């Protein structure tokens, strides 16, 4: 039962005699912050009182008089300035727990009006190894797809791979100039990855040298500005004619100028690291000298590929499957699957048609030789074809949108892409209406950046993005140290062998990285800290997984060799036929928390917010821990009490397991 939705409907009825817009206030219902205020609380009376010219307590009293909830709640109470406190009847809690136990969906209702939803996520460039920057789109998109599917939506997942363009120009150039065909044929994945890294390093080296030459002047200007801003701020402190707010503004200006200097210095440090990595290596330095125009040469190879050059096209067809195998290996580790992997190459032959179609509609304009679409409300146009004839990402996105409309007829498309692409998506979505797709809801599910310990985007010392596989390996290694340490292993009965230890470390380590990402609000940045991620304390996957394992440990002991499936079925039958009872506040707290599972699922669905589910699972695990410490389950003298507590343990395990599965995280049966 989704209690907030039920309450909202009841409050609409109670509010109708008091206002013409009851829906404006009916949703002001929240779980109570403290059990002494009940289970749910409404503050609707406060804002409504201002509108109707009464005291908030009087309005609250009228609402309580009109409110018909005694079939579910004890008599509502008015507290403080006009809060309405509601405490659920224990009998309703018992019924809900019984129903959840008998329901394979653990009480989460399915939509009666399913929509076709396309979730576009991950989308790496397949020519290079996946890196830390790919983790957010991959795990957020996977979680949303799993949750929407569970809710009953008709979900189609699509990995819009970067399998065309410059990245393959880099590999082709690297293969032609540095590659050994025999080595590539014998061991394609590592050899192609190495060729990409080498060629790209030379490109980045040349770019870094060019950028560093201009940044010295920027730094000098920034330092001068910072010095001036500080002097002005310092002088203002003794100026009695200046208002405090003006002094504060000058201080902030000085601080911002100082941060600007620090930012430029950090960028210069990163550029110098890229340069030093090449200059300090004799072989790399020689290659950089011999291939000083590598960036231009790569663009030539890319252009030849786009034009259908037989040799480059043959190399692309040879290399692509190996590149896809490499990223699929990472997806297998992450337990992420896609319905479709239609990359940029799939749409290449459609791009000219997109430009022609937009031109026919009268939407295009030539500007400096490029074909553009000028959109109302935007300062700059959307460029769909450059003056040299090359197409852009925007053109591919438009071709993709047309294909998806014709092939899938979606109601909604979610683009799980980082926040830096916000302007692109605003323009792209603005194109939907003139293309006749205004009825499709397009959503940019944006997200922040993974940061290193220094608070900047996470990179290696040389300035490269850190490989995703190395992060996964590190997390698994640390997880094994935490959950398979000798003290813990000594308590395991039966003993835990090496293979099981490695399986659990993999489950915990991969889960830790996923959960750490999903537990943050998706639009915020977060610092990557593997030690915190695998910790057994705090809001971590490890803590939630351990809580699940504790439920299974109790049930194994209680089943006395009967086997968990049969034992849990017996618990279900007993809960359906025998009365439940609460003898401790922590029993009731756990039951109430379990009832709120559907509310957490709804937050993920409505707000594309996986962190709401993480928060719920963490709170459930904490509530279960309190229950476990204060409420003896096994060997209780009162059969009714033991039966109730066993039912709560079974349901806690199911809710934690299902919740983690929606996050894309596995569980271990023992830890």
Swiss-Prot record:
Gene Ontology CC: one annotated term: cytoplasm
CDD domains: Anticodon_Ia_Arg, ArgRS_core
Keyword terms of this UniProt record: Aminoacyl-tRNA synthetase, ATP-binding, Cytoplasm, Ligase, Nucleotide-binding, Protein biosynthesis
Pfam entry (one): tRNA-synt_1d
Record field: compositional bias (Basic and acidic residues): 224-233
GO biological process: arginyl-tRNA aminoacylation
Extent of motif 'HIGH' region: 124-134
Catalysed reactions, semicolon-separated: tRNA(Arg) + L-arginine + ATP = L-arginyl-tRNA(Arg) + AMP + diphosphate
One MF term in the entry's GO annotations: arginine-tRNA ligase activity
E.C. numbers: 6.1.1.19
Keyword Transferase in annotation: no
Subcellular location: Cytoplasm
Region described as Disordered: 223-254
Residues making up the signal peptide according to the UniProt record: none
InterPro entries, sorted: aa-tRNA-synth_I_CS, Arg-tRNA-ligase, Arg-tRNA-synth_N, Arg-tRNA-synth_N_sf, ArgRS_core, DALR_anticod-bd, Rossmann-like_a/b/a_fold, tRNAsynth_Ia_anticodon-bd
PANTHER family: ARGININE--TRNA LIGASE, CYTOPLASMIC, ARGINYL-TRNA SYNTHETASE
NCBIfam families linked to this entry: argS
Quaternary context: Monomer.
Assigned protein family: Belongs to the class-I aminoacyl-tRNA synthetase family.
Name of the molecule in the record: Arginine--tRNA ligase
